[in-house]
Swiss-Prot record:
GO cellular component: outer membrane-bounded periplasmic space
GO biological process: Gram-negative-bacterium-type cell outer membrane assembly; protein folding; protein stabilization
Protein name: Chaperone SurA
Organismal lineage: Bacteria, Pseudomonadati, Pseudomonadota, Betaproteobacteria, Burkholderiales
Annotated EC: 5.2.1.8
Role: Chaperone involved in the correct folding and assembly of outer membrane proteins. Recognizes specific patterns of aromatic residues and the orientation of their side chains, which are found more frequently in integral outer membrane proteins. May act in both early periplasmic and late outer membrane-associated steps of protein maturation.
Coiled-coil ranges from the UniProt annotation: none
InterPro entries reported for this sequence: OMP_Chaperone_SurA (IPR050280), PPIase_dom_sf (IPR046357), PPIase_PpiC (IPR000297), PPIase_SurA (IPR023034), SurA_N (IPR015391), Trigger_fact/SurA_dom_sf (IPR027304)
Entry keywords, A to Z: Chaperone, Isomerase, Periplasm, Repeat, Rotamase, Signal
C-alpha cells in the first residue's frame, strides 16, 4: 500500500477553487437582480461574452460568503471589477483548453464530486443537499467542477509539466536552510498591494502604474491606515479579496528583494519604498514572524503510526457495498469494537495479518488521498471511508513522533518546495501572457 515518493507539480486545490469560483446563486437571488440588466454584455472575451447575469451571480455569491465569514465586503463597484477580472481570466483559459482538445469526462467529474463529499464526511446525496441549501443549484456546481478540472489539466499541460528542478538547485536550497542562521530562521507573514506594470510594457504605462503605486504607498503609510481594506479595494493581485494576505512564507520562497525589504521591519510596519518586481510594483506589510515551519530547515520529520482496513472494489463488491460495509464497521468500532480484529477478519490488504498495522509512516510514503485523510485525524480517531486507487479504507492513527529525515527525504522536500515556487511564478507569467494576447473589451463601466 506504500508508494515511492515522487515530485509532483503544484496541484490546483480543487476544493478551495470550487468554493471560490462557483458562480451560481439561488433563484431568489437571481430574481432580485432584476431582468433589465441580466443579459447585458459586460465583457467580450475573444469570440465569447460575459453577461450581466453571470457577473451578478458571481458577485452575489462572493458577497454572501464574505458576510458569512464576517469579512469586510468591498464597495460594489470594486467587487464587480475584481470579480469580472477573475471571470475574464477563467473564460480565456477555458477557451485555450478547448483549443488544446482538453476534455473532462463524466466519470472523472463524478469521482471528483465523490471525493469532495468524502472530504466533508458525507455521502454524495448529502453533499448535494448541503450545496443546494447554500443556494447553489447542483447542476451549476457540477459544471463548475468540470471547468476547474479542465483548467487544472490545462495548467498541468502548459506549465507544471515543463517545470524542472536540478540537483544543483536542490543542493543550494538545502545549503541555504542549513546555513549559520538556519536555527534562527523565521517564516514571514506578509500582506501586499500589487500594481501591474510588466517590464515589457511601454514606458508611459509603467510611469502611470508607478505613480498609482506611489499614491497607494502613501495611503498605506498614513497613520491609522487599514492596509487590508486598501488591498481589497486597490490591489491588482488575485488575492486582493483576501486583503492581500500571502500567509506565512519561508524566506527561500520569496523574491530576495522582498526578503531584504522586510528584514528591518517590525510586525505591523509597511515597507517605506516600492519594490519593483518583474511584472509590477509591490507594497509590502510585515504582519508577523514565527519560527520556521519549513521541513527542509530541520532534519526532523513527523512520522505517523497508522493502521487501516481495506476493502477492494470489483472483487465481488460494488462501490456502494464496500463503502457501506466500512461505515457499519466504523460504527461498531466506535461502540467499543476491536479495530485489530475487524482488520484481521475483513481487510484485503497484506497488513491484515498484523491487524492492519502499517507501522510508522513518513510523509510521502502513502498515496495522497490516504495521507491527506490520515493527517486530519487525532490519535485514536477512526476516519470515514476513504477512497484511493486501491479501494476504500478505514484509517486509525495510533500516534505520531519526530524522526530524523533521511538525506533522500530532505532532498525530496527541497525539490518539492523549489518546484512549487517555480511553478507558481511560471503560471503567473503564462496567465499574464495569455491575457495580453487575448482580445478583451470591458463593456460595463466598472471601477478600476
Amino acid at each position: 500500500m506504500k508508494k515511492t515518493l515522487r515530485f509532483a507539480a503544484v496541484a490546483s486545490g480543487l476544493v478551495a477553487s470550487l468554493i471560490t469560483v462557483a458562480p451560481s446563486a439561488s433563484a431568489q437571488a437571481l430574481r432580485a437582480q432584476g431582468a433589465s440588466l441580466a443579459d447585458e454584455v459586460v465583457a467580450v472575451v475573444n469570440n465569447d461574452v460575459i453577461t450581466g447575469r453571470e457577473l451578478d451571480q458571481r458577485v452575489g455569491l462572493i458577497a454572501r460568503r464574505l458576510q458569512q465569514q464576517k469579512a469586510p465586503v468591498p464597495p460594489t463597484d470594486q467587487l464587480r471589477a475584481q470579480v469580472l477580472n477573475q471571470m475574464v481570466l477563467e473564460r480565456i483559459q477555458v477557451q485555450r483548453a478547448k483549443d488544446d482538445g482538453i476534455v473532462v469526462d463524466n466519470a472523472t467529474v463524478q469521482a471528483t464530486l465523490g471525493r469532495l463529499a468524502q472530504a466533508n464526511g458525507m455521502q454524495l446525496d448529502q453533499y448535494k443537499a448541503r450545496i443546494e441549501a447554500q443556494g447553489v443549484p447542483w447542476d451549476l456546481f457540477v459544471r463548475d467542477a468540470r471547468t476547474e478540472l479542465m483548467l487544472s489539466k490545462l495548467r498541468e499541460k502548459e506549465v507544471d509539466s515543463k517545470i524542472t528542478v536540478s540537483d544543483a538547485e536542490v543542493a543550494s536550497y538545502i545549503a541555504s536552510q542549513r546555513g549559520p542562521n538556519a536555527g534562527s530562521q523565521q517564516d514571514l507573514r506578509l500582506e501586499h498591494i500589487f500594481v501591474k506594470a510588466p517590464a515589457n510594457a511601454p514606458q508611459a504605462d509603467i510611469d502611470v502604474a508607478q505613480k498609482k503605486a506611489e499614491g497607494l504607498l502613501q495611503q498605506a503609510l498614513a497613520s491609522g491606515a487599514n492596509f487590508e481594506r486598501l488591498a481589497k479595494n486597490q490591489s491588482e493581485a488575485d488575492d486582493a479579496k483576501k486583503g492581500g494576505d500571502l500567509g506565512f512564507k519561508s524566506p527561500a520562497s520569496l523574491p530576495s528583494d522582498v526578503v531584504d525589504a522586510v528584514s528591518k521591519l517590525r510586525p505591523g510596519e509597511v515597507n517605506p519604498t516600492l519594490i519593483r518586481v518583474p511584472d509590477g510594483f509591490e507594497i509590502v506589510r510585515l504582519v508577523e514572524r514565527r519560527a520556521s515551519q519549513n521541513p527542509a530547515a530541520s532534519p526532523k520529520i513527523v512520522q505517523t503510526h497508522v493502521r487501516h482496513i481495506l476493502l477492494r472494489v470489483g472483487e465481488g463488491k460494488s462501490e456502494s457495498q464496500a463503502r457501506q460495509q466500512l461505515i457499519d464497521i466504523r460504527r461498531q468500532i466506535e461502540s467499543g469494537g476491536d479495530f485489530e480484529k475487524f482488520a484481521r477478519t475483513y481487510s484485503q490488504d497484506g497488513s491484515a495479518s498484523q491487524g492492519g498495522d502499517l507501522g510508522w509512516i513518513s510523509p510521502g510514503e502513502t498515496v495522497p488521498e490516504f495521507e491527506r485523510a490520515m493527517n486530519t485525524l487525532q490519535d485514536g480517531q477512526v476516519s470515514n471511508p476513504v477512497r484511493t486507487e486501491y479501494g476504500y479504507h478505514l484509517i486509525q492513527v495510533l500516534g505520531r513522533r519526530d524522526a530524523e529525515g533521511s538525506v533522500q527525504q530532505q532532498m525530496d522536500i527541497a525539490r518539492q518546495a523549489i518546484g512549487q515556487r517555480k511553478a507558481e511564478q511560471a503560471y503567473s507569467d503564462w496567465l499574464r501572457e495569455l491575457r495580453d494576447s487575448s482580445y478583451v473589451q470591458i463593456k460595463l463601466p466598472v471601477a478600476q
